[in-house]
Curated annotation (Swiss-Prot):
Keywords: ATP-binding, Kinase, Nucleotide biosynthesis, Nucleotide-binding, Transferase. It catalyses: dTMP + ATP = dTDP + ADP. Belongs to the thymidylate kinase family. It comes from Leifsonia xyli subsp. xyli (strain CTCB07). The gene is tmk. PANTHER family: THYMIDYLATE KINASE, UMP-CMP KINASE 2, MITOCHONDRIAL. Disulfide bonds: none annotated. Phosphorylation of dTMP to form dTDP in both de novo and salvage pathways of dTTP synthesis. CDD domains: TMPK. It comes from the Bacteria. This is Thymidylate kinase.
């Protein structure tokens, strides 16, 4: 069960597969929000804290296999610490938290990608986050072939998830689109469009809320 949204800040998350342009849009959105005079905390999962950086190194760069349930628990541990020490305090101060990946990533990557029970992964994530849901989740959607081409042009080395087979990434994308059937929280954006068009659509959705 989620906690009611009765906080002074605004919690925005960016989701989508690898190579869809989350970091680019996060940077543009941060610049726009700062221009409006809002205090912004830009962060990410995993890796938004010192502890999270260590967990990120394990889940993305450790050699060898990690059991799917162990992987899900590591992400949940990162989330619990990150929400308690970074996200909630910022929201309580009335700031905008702009975050690259959150619990929907766990449902898509560990639930669908790793073929775990998506409902259990979601409940684990909500427990770790004490029920905290974003005010808006921006899902950047892009077909896997284009996303992989973008990623390949920007990387010399793939992390553990990026290196998974195409079937894995197809399951992840399908899971994201299924999650986005929650229209009050999600904005689904066609990430094949020009960067500035995408940024304008995101700003339009936020107009009046910031």
């Amino acid at each position: 069960m989620s906690v009611p949204t009765n906080r002074p800040g605004l919690f925005i998350t960016l989701e989508g597969g690898d190579g869809v342009g989350k970091s680019t849009q996060a940077a543009l959105l941060e610049r726009w929000l700062l221009g409006l005079g809002r205090a912004v905390v830009r962060t990410r999962e995993p890796g938004g804290t010192d502890l999270g950086a260590e967990i990120r190194e394990i889940v993305l760069h450790r050699r060898g296999d990690i059991a799917p349930r162990a992987e899900a628990l590591l992400y949940a541990a990162d989330r619990a610490h990150h929400v308690a020490t970074v996200v909630r305090p910022a929201l309580e101060r009335g700031e905008v938290v702009l975050q690259d990946r959150y619990l929907d990533s766990s449902v898509a990557y560990q639930g669908a990608g790793r073929v775990l029970d998506a409902g259990e992964v979601r409940e684990l994530s909500l427990w770790a986050a004490e029920g905290l849901l974003p005010d808006l989740t921006i899902l950047l959607d892009l077909d896997e072939t284009t996303a992989r081409a973008r990623l390949g042009s920007a990387r010399t080395r793939y992390d553990r998830l990026e290196a998974e087979r195409s079937e894995f990434h197809a399951r992840v994308r399908a899971a994201y689109l299924a999650l986005a059937a929650e229209p009050q929280r999600f904005l689904v954006v066609d990430a094949s469009r020009p960067v500035e068009e995408i940024a304008a659509e995101i700003r339009c959705r936020l107009d009046g809320r910031v």
